[in-house]
């Protein structure tokens, strides 16, 4: 999903918090949600990768969305979660503070972000989503990473170095 969706359709969105804001993401690419119990740091990984986890024999890079969007925030959530999702860069884990709920929203309700807000992180923000008494920020999973970061991830060797068994 890289642009505002066509009208008259309904989206299922998962709501989650990162720092002070509530974001939403289309659940179509969501594979599962798991508790964050830590990750393995890989020295050769690009800087935007917090670490890796192995889930069902698959190595999954973890991106800390809080660190990307709010690097100035020092406090950390007690029990962060990881959204395991499909992207053009492959399967990635997005570390978030908390997951709230799933909502159904008509695409007619989506509002384009004002031009001044688009500059915060380029095309990451797709739309503003008014829902009941709240306002959510719809983000594009494909734009969590820049083109250069996607290439770096594709080229990265995320296999942890083997330890000497001597």
Q: What is each stretch, according to the model?
A:
Residues 1-166:
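An acidic, low-aromatic, low-complexity terminal/linker signal
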């Amino acid at each position: 999903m890289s642009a505002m969706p066509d009208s008259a359709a309904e989206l299922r969105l998962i709501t989650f918090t990162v720092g002070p804001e509530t974001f939403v993401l289309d659940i179509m690419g969501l594979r599962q949600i798991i508790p964050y119990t830590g990750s393995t740091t890989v020295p050769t990984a690009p800087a935007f990768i917090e670490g890796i986890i192995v889930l069902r024999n698959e190595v999954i890079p973890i991106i800390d969305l809080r660190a990307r969007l709010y690097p100035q925030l020092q406090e950390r959530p007690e029990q962060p979660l990881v959204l395991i999702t499909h992207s053009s860069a492959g399967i990635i884990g997005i570390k978030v503070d908390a997951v709230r709920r799933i909502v159904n929203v008509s695409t007619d309700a989506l509002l384009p972000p004002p031009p001044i807000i688009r500059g915060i992180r380029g095309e990451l923000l797709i739309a503003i989503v008014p829902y009941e008494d709240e306002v959510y920020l719809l983000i594009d999973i494909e734009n969590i990473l820049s083109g250069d970061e996607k290439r770096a991830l594709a080229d990265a060797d995320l296999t942890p170095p083997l330890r000497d068994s001597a």
